């Protein structure tokens, strides 16, 4: 049996995937190849992250855009540790039993945001099914700490689904008033059992709907991956579901297989197909659409937030 050699500390990153059959990691087409990171700005961002003892999803998820984003002094902070309680078939974040929450982490995220001079910050997390509120209050404290340390910074959060947690947990995060509330649907309903087995599609959809019900002024955002075996019709249905839930901003990107033990890539979606999906999504009424092979939830998040605000103003002016 092949062994996943990627580790967190002394243990395998994905112990639950050790028994999975090996599937070849396909060679990327030209449009998915990026330069290896290493610029001076990249190293400076890395130093701020490390000196503040923070975790980023850029590193943990193996994001292909890390070189570009860190060169621009952008980073997506991942709170509540580096070990997730879920075992999604697409994700490179480690799975296992997490450590206790670090009560000083919110303040360190705030300090790093101020130190990096971020105009827009993205905060995500691992799933913490072991916590009574799923980590909701830790999100609230992090939002407050960022506002205290860097009042002018706009805040985008990418949350877990808070499944089987009190509704009050989600409501506390909404009431902290992040500028953008993102929760990814990740894939089409038919593929949930194999790709996102610990989650439920309609629960995630309802979460996005609840955000709009509680605070209609809050921007909502969600994303999916393509290249997992979904059909165009299924993607279009997800778009319709998102619009029914009031989602303002959709992101669509290519799934990239982290290791031989993860879900295999069904196909590489050509950039022309992404452009077609973008046109379809815009026609369905999304305020913002980002659809490309390298699109990820937090890629160009600051620039996209400015466009999102402008799109809302234009829509309100035209009404």
From Swiss-Prot:
Transmembrane segments: none annotated. One of its GO terms (molecular function) is 4 iron, 4 sulfur cluster binding. Residues 1-24 are annotated as: Disordered. It is an enzyme of class 2 (transferase). HAMAP family: Lipoyl_synth (MF_00206). InterPro entries: Aldolase_TIM, Elp3/MiaA/NifB-like_rSAM, Lipoyl_synth, rSAM. It is found in: Cytoplasm. SMART domains: Elp3. This is Lipoyl synthase.
